[in-house]
């Protein structure tokens, strides 16, 4: 799961550069000097010199020493820190399990309410996804299983995680904190390509139209970001704070929809020319691709996919 700080007496504090700050696994309510942790084993996972990033990297702490259940740090980049914000170690390597007892309860709840997707946060390997799949089956949950790629280890084990999942989420927030902002754009393209090669779905997420939390229109950079995700071949783009806490939830959906529709009109993604040289394992996939190429060259306006299970339509959607 995502590792978080606890709550503060006043709901939030301001950390100043070069000030000492303690992460205390036994602290109940925090203040400007210390705060609790929801992951009690974090002191075992860090050592002096480690860099800890809080609130998606907005604040930065350097570990000075570990004393029992306390992590003594120095604030390197300060700012406001509020309740339940996330913690990452730069470079990854935390031992927190992907699935907790609460996750198992949540999977059972998901089965009862009939959700379409179950996403596993912070998986490290295929083993985490197989465990989630087993729990879903035991609970009678038929949802598609999505791996949120957020850890350095998940990037290294991407192929096996894809094979164990129905799709992946390119979760750029925590991923950027672990691998560095500059590495994320290339990784996004790599992950989408790897998923497409396996006919697995991809969801691209995090700060796609972040400015629309407070602004009625997106920035040009955000428009380009969303469009490029579509051009990369992502199956879905996702909003978070923009709709959960933003002032313009309807407008941001409308804006994102317009950008996606315009990007999908691009001839560059109409057909993937690498498919010409691809060897197909499934007859239905090869027939679907042949139909798409035929339709493209005949300039038809639509394809009617006759299907009983819906799989034909899914196969034919893959070039886009």
Segments predicted by a language model, with ranges:
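Non-catalytic helical/linker scaffolds that mediate oligomerization, partner binding
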Residues: 1-320
């Amino acid at each position: 799961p995502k590792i978080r700080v606890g709550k503060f007496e006043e709901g939030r504090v301001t950390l100043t550069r070069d000030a000492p700050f303690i992460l205390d696994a036994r602290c109940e309510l925090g203040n400007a000097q210390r705060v609790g942790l929801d992951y009690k084993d974090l002191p075992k996972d860090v050592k002096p010199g480690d860099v800890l990033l809080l609130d998606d990297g907005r604040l930065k702490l350097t570990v000075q020493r570990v004393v029992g259940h306390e992590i003594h740090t120095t604030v390197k980049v300060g700012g406001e820190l509020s309740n339940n914000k996330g913690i990452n170690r730069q470079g990854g390597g935390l031992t927190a399990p992907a699935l907790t007892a609460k996750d198992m309860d949540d999977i059972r709840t998901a089965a009862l309410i009939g959700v379409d997707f179950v996403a596993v946060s912070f998986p490290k390997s295929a083993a985490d996804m197989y465990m989630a799949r087993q729990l879903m089956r035991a609970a009678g949950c038929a949802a598609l299983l999505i791996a949120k790629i957020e850890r350095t280890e998940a990037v290294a084990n991407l192929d096996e995680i894809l094979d164990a999942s129905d799709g992946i989420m390119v979760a750029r927030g925590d991923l950027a904190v672990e691998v560095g902002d500059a590495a994320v754009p290339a990784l996004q393209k790599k992950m989408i390509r790897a998923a497409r090669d396996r006919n697995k779905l991809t969801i691209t997420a995090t700060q796609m139209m972040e400015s629309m939390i407070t602004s009625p229109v997106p920035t040009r950079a955000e428009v380009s970001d969303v469009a490029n995700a579509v051009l990369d071949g992502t199956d879905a783009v996702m909003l978070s704070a923009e709709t959960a806490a933003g002032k313009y939830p309807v407008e941001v959906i409308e804006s994102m929809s317009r950008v996606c529709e315009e990007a999908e009109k691009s001839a560059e993604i109409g057909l993937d020319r690498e498919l010409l040289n691809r060897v197909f394992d499934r007859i239905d996939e090869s027939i679907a691709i042949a139909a798409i190429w035929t339709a493209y060259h005949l300039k038809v306006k639509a394809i009617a996919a006759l299907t009983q299970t819906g799989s034909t339509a899914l196969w034919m959607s893959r070039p886009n």
